[in-house]
Amino acid sequence: MYLLIPAAGIGKRMGSNRNKLLLKVRSQPIIAWTLLAAEAANTISWIGIISQPTDWPDFRAILADLKLTKPVELIQGGSTRQESVYNGLQALPLAAEQVLIHDGARCLATPDLFNSCAQAIRHCPGLIAGVPVKDTIKVVDEQGIIQETPDRQKLWAAQTPQGFDVKLLKQCHAEGVRQGWEVTDDAALFEKCGIEVRIVEGEETNLKVTTPQDLAIAEFILTTRGV
């Protein structure tokens, strides 16, 4: 299975002006934990890191330190996540029929989750990892007045990995460019094109490290794992 990791974000909410994936959690950069999980997943055979060239020296140093056995390619990112994934799709080896896309900041995803998604995508056009929502969700207007309370039984919090048929995802990205769609994940492109996307049970610990509080939680979870 081929894995693309969007990794071009700046850690503004971390109070940092550099790529947040270079920040350390328990002595390793955030991106290193993501890469180690992908390395340990027996279904993953190739990894593409989509990032800005200014970060490549740092990423190369991390890769040299990790000594991964799987091929890793650095791919130039775009100005948005959507553009970055599009660039990543163009850089996939020709043999790639399915692809997993995983946020580099979700550094707590386990090898088992990568394997589950890699196996499931062979039987459907698209999927995302996700977990059922526990909190009651409110829809509010611009004035902060509650308009609606959706049925919690139908709500899932989207995570990554997300998996797709490569040919279909390329078509959806091309349609997104033509239509001027702006989306926050690739599943939304499939939805707009009317293509089925399934849910694979994710992991409660698979949080996206975005704030200093997330960083502290990630430290705690990694400590409990004994790594």
UniProtKB/Swiss-Prot annotation:
UniProt-listed GO biological process terms: isopentenyl diphosphate biosynthetic process, methylerythritol 4-phosphate pathway
Alphabetized UniProt keyword annotations: Isoprene biosynthesis, Nucleotidyltransferase, Transferase
InterPro entries listed in its UniProt record: IspD, IspD/TarI, IspD/TarI_cytidylyltransf_bact, ISPD_synthase_CS, Nucleotide-diphossugar_trans
Pathway: Isoprenoid biosynthesis; isopentenyl diphosphate biosynthesis via DXP pathway; isopentenyl diphosphate from 1-deoxy-D-xylulose 5-phosphate: step 2/6
EC numbers: 2.7.7.60
Signal peptide coordinates: none
Listed name of the protein: 2-C-methyl-D-erythritol 4-phosphate cytidylyltransferase
Presence of the UniProt keyword Nucleotidyltransferase in the record: yes
